[in-house]
Amino acid sequence: MTQQAAEVAKRRTFAIISHPDAGKTTITEKLLLMGKAISVAGTVKSRKSDRHATSDWMEMEKQRGISITTSVMQFPYRDHMINLLDTPGHEDFSEDTYRTLTAVDSALMVLDGGKGVEPRTIALMDVCRLRDTPIVSFINKLDRDIRDPIELLDEIEAVLKIKAAPITWPIGCYRDFKGVYHLADDYIIVYTAGHGHERTETKIIEKLDSDEARAHLGDEYERFVEQLELVQGACHEFNQQEFIDGQLTPVFFGTALGNFGVDHVLDAVVNWAPKPLARVANERTVEPAEEKFSGFVFKIQANMDPKHRDRIAFMRICSGRYDKGMKMRHVRLGKDVRIGDALTFFSSEREQLEEAYAGDIIGLHNHGTIQIGDTFTEGEALGFTGIPHFAPELFRRVRLKDPLKSKQLRQGLQQLAEEGATQVFFPQRSNDIILGAVGVLQFDVVASRLKEEYKVECAYEPITVWSARWIDCDDKKKLEEFENKAVENLAVDGGGHLTYLAPTRVNLALMEERWPDVKFRATREHH
């Protein structure tokens, strides 16, 4: 095995998906703690400490306690290199989340044991299913009251349409939480709460059929043994291939806050989740062990660091290796660039990178030339597929409070649109600026970021736009004819693409009927 193949085999790149408040930020911290990437796991939102989770770094996130933007963290664990991507937990951020999930090889689903499967989890699982992403499940908050675990597994199967195979099983919950039993290997892991940055020593009781186990479970012993018989009779057994195919999820129980069970999940990712996988490009399939470098940009993030007014493009490496100072071809522009200052992300700490391999996520400084979906190679013209833009569902007209700041407004919106935080449209017949979003919160985010980062205050006005469609037409003459007739509703988006802003559903249906040669697209691949 070459050194490069060995490095790729060590990589595990995964994202955490959950409904807001299921404990995603806490679990992120505890995972980093396992990899010793942060020394103090600050309890998020706690009154005792004002330390915020390092992955929730933007002002607005700090106020609302939701991770609005994906951040990337790399840390070592058991001779492996883990790349952890945090996804926005709020329902308004489906585009950003979708694109993040195109950059990973597996996902960790965190469920609140008291609530079970929630709407946001369902939406994220739908996205994972599009790519058959393997899912590891963690049922969290066993230090509180939870629903019946068998009921929770049934719900995962019924609602998320995936087989659930419990690997560990909880012994009690809330004040009676005594630990978990490992179903396949017949041992008990005793619960001792470890808060903050404490990593408690694990106490193991070998064999359920032992005096020590009987003493630990006390009066609950007989009932627990009966429950286990039921579980083992009714539940699926773990099957590696079904997991890799995205048809079965191994389920673990624990409490991230009490620092218990998180290591079981990380072990599962290392032992079972796939190493970096091959990627489909328009031209061919790219294997991770190929010598030549290739990668695609799945996210652009403005102002990650108030100290540096900058934009960072996040790139997933698909093949080869990155070496500091190497020359790459920016395929869309057909330009060669030398990249000497790529970054890796150790939580919110940035470090200059010397080398990186397939599966790693690196950050490139972006001075406005890089767009989402861009491919970088060592010369080959490749375009990776499946990184879409979605048509927004909500629209607002932007009104400036200070008319002298229109230049800053345009610049700010252009940058925010580039990173996928919003979509911006410039109608051909007016000087209006129209914003499109997938959820209402996105408008708040844009307004607060314009104010914080670009010193521009704006207000929103309602506008009669039902939906946007990207226009495509092979017949130049027909396209010109269409542009003349439909000019009242035509706009150009932030990337310069012609867009039809349909005032109503009926109008769109009529236009599609009237112009059969014109394609009205609801999604647009990033070219």
Curated annotation (Swiss-Prot):
It holds the Pfam family EF-G_D2. GO terms for biological process: regulation of translational termination. Coiled coil: none annotated. The keyword Phosphoprotein does not apply. It is found in: Cytoplasm. Keywords: Cytoplasm, GTP-binding, Nucleotide-binding, Protein biosynthesis. Its main location: cytoplasm. GO terms for cellular component: cytosol. InterPro entries: EF-G-like_DII, EFG_III/V, G_TR_CS, P-loop_NTPase, PrfC, RF3_C, RF3_dom_3_sf, RF3_GTP-bd. HAMAP family: Rel_fac_3. Belongs to the TRAFAC class translation factor GTPase superfamily. Classic translation factor GTPase family. PrfC subfamily. This is Peptide chain release factor 3. The gene is prfC.
